[in-house]
Amino acid sequence: MEKRSSIKNRGVLRLPPGFRFHPTDEELVVQYLRRKVTGLPLPASVIPETDVCKSDPWDLPGDCESEMYFFSTREAKYPNGNRSNRSTGSGYWKATGLDKQIGKKKLVVGMKKTLVFYKGKPPNGTRTNWVLHEYRLVDSQQDSLYGQNMNWVLCRVFLKKRSNSNSKRKEDEKEEVENEKETETEREREEENKKSTCPIFYDFMRKDTKKKRRRRRCCDLNLTPATCCCCSSSTSSSSVCSSALTHTSSNDNRQEISYRENKFCLFL
């Protein structure tokens, strides 16, 4: 079989066409970083050695449009300190968030630190979209296994793509308006269904007012006419009318009698 020559671009070994280097965090720590520290052969020669913090991210060897992987050493910022010097010619790398454990809870194989590149001098730098993931071995594991203070780390550098925030906001606003309309229509339907299906209950145990008691008494058929206010009023009015009629009738009778007497006198 013919040996395939490795493809080089700006000093970086490249995979053949159709292949893509996309390892997981655990694979980077176990299969590459640990082997690099112990001197074991690597699965593939695709990760070069370079000092990431000595050059700006856009000047690093490799394709800026894709993810770039490097072996690098950590340089202490102070002689007796543990902080790394992450200043470049145009800016600096700033850590963001907490370090992430790589591996299972019982067996942690490494740590992952996320950094963002800022242009200018701290603390007044301007944030960019360049992101750096720094992988390192656990300190206790490194000291016990290798005996030496090896400062090797594995770095993944990439440019975060910008998203159109205005269009995204507009889409979110449209979705919110549509959701509000749907909820309003659902509420209206629920209210209509409640009105059509909900029975009407009367509370017979509540206290009645005086007016309501009078109305109920008038409308009650079991009450006698003497006790009913409406009937009593009607009977009183009828009695008044009857007395008036009797009075008028008696007056008429008297006039008729007087008329007859006068008539009889004339005949005599």
Curated annotation (Swiss-Prot):
It comes from the Eukaryota. InterPro entries: NAC-dom (IPR003441), NAC_dom_sf (IPR036093). Keywords: Activator, DNA-binding, Nucleus, Transcription, Transcription regulation. Residues 166-190 are annotated as: Disordered. One of its GO terms (cellular component) is nucleus. Residues 15-160 form the NAC domain. Its main location: nucleus. Residues 180-190 have a biased composition (Basic and acidic residues). It is found in: Nucleus. One of its GO terms (molecular function) is DNA-binding transcription factor activity. Residues 109-166 bind DNA. Disruption phenotype: No visible phenotype under normal growth conditions. SUPFAM superfamilies: NAC domain. Transcription activator of the mannan synthase CSLA9. Recognizes and binds to DNA-specific sequence of CSLA9 promoter. The NAC domain includes a DNA binding domain and a dimerization domain. This is NAC domain-containing protein 41.
